[in-house]
């Protein structure tokens, strides 16, 4: 008689038959994400953004699991390797403030009071940040982006 093959066990790691065991149909957390394997062999892997944030664009890491297939009284174990590829994560820019007297110019240059400073982050390990735009449309003055991490803000009284 023909029997249907089903997945009967799932474990973390690449050594067949060993590693932390999971439950079929429930999530098993690996290093870079969570794997859910169903008895029929279908599976879903959800990458953990926080775990993969430090990857640069194109960098790859793997999450490895092993599973057991049962058909009747026969079993076999195999390894499933999931490759996680880094992407260019968006930086997180924090608001900055400055003050200037009317008619004067506020200059922020590279140094301890950069527009780009310790409160602005990019999770990619080797990314560097730069100012690409300054939001305009204020009611009290205008701003101009300068070189990396610098800006000039000239305020003038508007009628």
Would you name each region that the model predicts?
Residues 1-29, 92-149:
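Extracellular ectodomain surface segments
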């Amino acid at each position: 008689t023909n029997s249907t093959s089903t997945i009967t066990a799932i474990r973390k790691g690449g050594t067949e038959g060993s590693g932390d065991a999971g439950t079929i149909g429930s999530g098993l957390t690996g290093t870079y994400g969570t794997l859910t394997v169903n008895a029929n062999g279908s599976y879903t892997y959800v990458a953990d953004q926080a775990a993969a944030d430090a990857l640069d664009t194109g960098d790859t890491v793997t999450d490895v699991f092993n599973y057991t297939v049962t058909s009747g009284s026969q079993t076999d174990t195999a390894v499933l390797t999931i490759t996680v590829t880094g992407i260019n994560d968006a930086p997180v820019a924090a608001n900055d403030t400055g003050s200037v007297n009317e008619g004067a110019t506020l200059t922020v240059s590279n140094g301890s009071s950069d527009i780009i400073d310790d409160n602005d982050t990019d999770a990619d390990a080797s990314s560097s940040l730069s100012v690409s735009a300054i939001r305009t449309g204020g009611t009290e003055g205008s701003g101009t982006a300068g070189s990396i991490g610098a800006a000039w803000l000239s305020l003038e009284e508007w009628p």
